[in-house]
């Protein structure tokens, strides 16, 4: 008699794990889906296998919570299910951040019944709806040979792709004959009036163009009908914007000619946060747990590491090491229009923009290109606004609240790529936040005021 446990920690149960159960003839009691190096009861599932019926099209979409990706994919399922003789299936996977977090949509379509009650591991089509993900997640490797990869980015030129794509992605695309396409959904969203963050219908249209599940003209017609049904109560203007976005999405997909040089790329590059500092509890948690979980590799964390946090508590301050870089637009400071009100840092929900009081010596230690003004009312001190674009979510609250000087705002929301290009912008933030609080500055402006309060952060 054998007995085992599965689905521990809500983990997905795959065909490879079930096969491992049937092959097991040693462990009377076992677990699957986890790496148990404490009791050593876990079974090694080995390589993932495909059990979907032949001809089934598997798709995976990586989106950002609240960007509309999940809603668009639910519409896609309805369109295909209602207008073809195909079977359709969809699973949606979210992280705990919800809005602003990672969403993964797993879609399957086929002529035969689909009984795959698990997430897509090997896909015919993968779409990356946020360009920051390409350096954080191992998504291209989920494609089967000859599969299609769609990347939403603003740097779809040969030079931009050469600069931004990590070597392991280039190599995989080349070696596995991946059909690679790009689209600038943010630009299209702005041009069609949808805005920079509501890119769902744009990328849905691009998907139907590339997937060849339904003829492109019919798919566009069905999408427009769905837009009329969904947004009709909000007015014809909203419907027209969605229809324009649908047309533009299909027309602006760009095929990338993969150069032979990509097959010679070496090494791997991922934007993985590595913690350091005096707080060992934070450093250990970030490096052993958080970095892997944020990289969608949490299922590989062994039980011995997880058991360290058996009581459920985690150290505070670990979010500072995430540096997700998910914002579409980030604030850029124009010091000439700044009145030093500190409203911007006061309203920022993620502490991604900070107002700093610096001594002359500290100002001299700031990276080259950092603008430091004389702090009004405090001779001998300098004032600077520093922005962490990698922590910013692009909400725009800072720019909206900024009174500026004579109506000219001191903060302008700029595309992330342009904001990050400011001289030593991220390094200025990392340097400034390490300086101590100036007690005499806080006493001058009073801790009970907005300005005084922000100099205590």
Where are the regions a protein language model picked out?
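Short hydrophobic/aromatic-rich motifs at helix boundaries and adjacent loops
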Residues: 47-50, 195, 221, 316-317
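Hydrophobic alpha-helical segments, principally membrane-spanning helices and signal/leader peptides
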Residues: 48, 53, 109, 115, ...
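Short, Gly/Pro- and small/polar-rich lid/capping loops
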Residues: 39-61, 449-456
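A cross-taxonomic marker for long C-terminal extensions/tails that follow the last structured domain
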Residues: 7-53
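Active-site cofactor/cluster-binding pocket
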Residues: 1, 8-9, 55-65, 69-291, ...
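Ferredoxin-type iron-sulfur electron-transfer modules and their immediate structural context
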Residues: 219, 232-391, 399-457
